[in-house]
From Swiss-Prot:
This protein's UniProt keywords: Cell membrane, Hydrolase, Lipoprotein, Membrane, Palmitate, Protein phosphatase
Gene: PSR2
GO cellular component, one term: cytosol
Protein name per the record: Probable phosphatase PSR2
Main localization (coarse): membrane
Every FCP1 homology domain range: 223-381
Function: Probable phosphatase. Involved in the response to sodium and lithium ion stress (but not to potassium or sorbitol stress) by inducing transcription of the sodium pump ENA1/PMR2. Acts through a calcineurin-independent pathway and is functionally redundant with PSR1. Also involved in the general stress response; acts together with WHI2 to activate stress response element (STRE)-mediated gene expression, possibly through dephosphorylation of MSN2.
Comp. bias regions, Basic residues: 29-38
Lipid-anchored residues (S-palmitoyl cysteine): C9, C10
Length: 397
């Protein structure tokens, strides 16, 4: 540090000696300096700020050239002035003189910044107006699209709802789902005249029935004489089926449609095997589905290899009421007081809601336990002490 200090001291003495040797400025040289400095300041623009002092013209030095170790002093900052007395055009280094600076640089800087702020505010105002116009156009576009969508949805809702289920391929007989109506139209399916009620037990033209009988099922076998009848839905109640590949499928059924074989992926509802084994001990079990037999029969063969399901009824056995497939319990051939239906669609049992045990539609939830949860209720209803299941279910559910 001593060596560096000596160098700095020598540099300071040299600077002082050099300043002492400078001859005094004359009026002629001062005018030349002022003219030369004015021209130079105009070419340098904002990077150099000229002071309006008649005696000296000094230029601010960029901050990058200032020494960071000066702590506010003028060491390291230099200005250049032409030496008029020497006549050789050399520039002598001068220390920056702030005491003679009558021009308020801070004020000029503030005015300059205020001008920038005003220009920025004007630009921002213009941009905000453009953004407001764009936002208004977008809002008008969204409102227009919303109105178009609302009109489209209104027209769609006015149309008859499509049939849900597996085979939505255009063939009239290849839809395995049991009901073509939507829940919103359930109340419209209820018969309103005495003629409608009297016709519920009569078979419709081309409606399936047990051979030699005017009912859907033949008379009870001896083994079921003391048991009530439990009717089960198939799709979304016991299983879920889809044409789309499902890695969790329990089995795959090849189904022929228009001379082409399609794979149907089937997953079983959790607890379905235990459920079927238990209810087969308590009831005469009937699977009644609105699906076509070419799909439902092979599915039931795979689902129930042990024969726990005693009867099977398909779409052709459904009661066609205003274009909807209804499971008419009055045509089963069993006393209504001993007949229960388990179905996920209220529209399918619209004629006899007091005999129904509702269950939610199932698609893939592996944590579902509804089939097992219903077993205790069915065990109670199977008791000989229950003379009319409809009166009990009408109060219980």
């Amino acid at each position: 540090m001593g060596f560096i200090a000596n160098i700095l001291c020598c540099s300071s003495d040299t600077s002082k000696t050099h300043r002492q040797r400078q001859p005094p400025e004359t009026n002629h040289n001062r005018n030349r300096n002022r003219k030369h400095s004015s021209n130079k300041a105009q070419t340098q623009g904002r990077k150099q700020k000229a002071t309006p002092n008649g005696d000296k013209m000094q230029y601010s030095t960029p901050e990058i050239l200032l020494s960071s170790s000066d702590s506010g002093s003028n060491a390291g900052s230099k200005t250049m002035q032409e030496n008029g007395n020497s006549g050789n055009g050399k520039l002598a280094p001068l220390s920056r003189d702030h005491s003679n600076n009558s021009y308020d640089e801070e004020k000029e800087y503030e005015d300059y910044n205020e001008g920038d702020v005003e220009m920025t505010e004007v630009n921002n105002a213009g941009e905000e107006e453009e953004e407001d116009d764009e936002a208004k156009e977008k809002q008008d576009h969204v409102v227009h699209e919303y109105n178009v969508d609302a009109d489209r949805n209104s027209s769609i809702n006015d149309e008859a709802p499509p049939q849900q289920g597996l085979y939505q391929v255009g063939q009239e007989d290849m839809n395995p789902q049991y009901v073509a109506s939507s829940p919103d139209n359930d109340l419209n399916l209820i018969p309103t005249t005495e003629e409608d009620f009297s016709d519920l037990t009569h078979l419709q033209p081309d409606q399936y029935h047990a051979p030699g009988y005017d009912t859907l099922l033949p008379p009870k076998l001896q083994e079921f004489q003391q048991k009530k009848c439990l009717i089960l839905d198939l799709d979304e109640t016991l299983v879920h089926s889809s044409f789309k590949y499902m890695h969790s499928a329990d089995f795959v059924l090849p189904v022929e449609i228009d001379d082409q074989v399609h794979n149907v992926y089937v997953i079983k509802r959790p607890g379905v095997d235990e459920f079927l084994n238990r209810v087969s001990q308590l009831y005469e079990v009937v699977v009644f589905t609105a699906s076509v037999s070419r799909y439902a029969n092979p599915l039931l063969d795979t689902l129930d290899p042990n024969g726990t399901i005693h009867h099977r009824l398909f779409r052709e056995a459904c009661y066609n009421y205003e274009g909807n497939y209804i499971k008419n319990l009055s045509q089963i051939g069993r006393p209504l007081s001993e007949t229960i239906i388990l179905d996920n669609s209220p529209a399918s049992y619209i004629f006899h809601p007091q005999h129904a045990v509702p269950i939610s539609s199932w698609f893939s939830d592996t944590h579902d336990n509804e089939l097992l949860d219903i077993i205790p209720l069915l065990e109670d209803l199977s008791s000989g002490n229950v003379l009319d299941v409809g009166s009990v279910l009408d109060v219980t559910i």
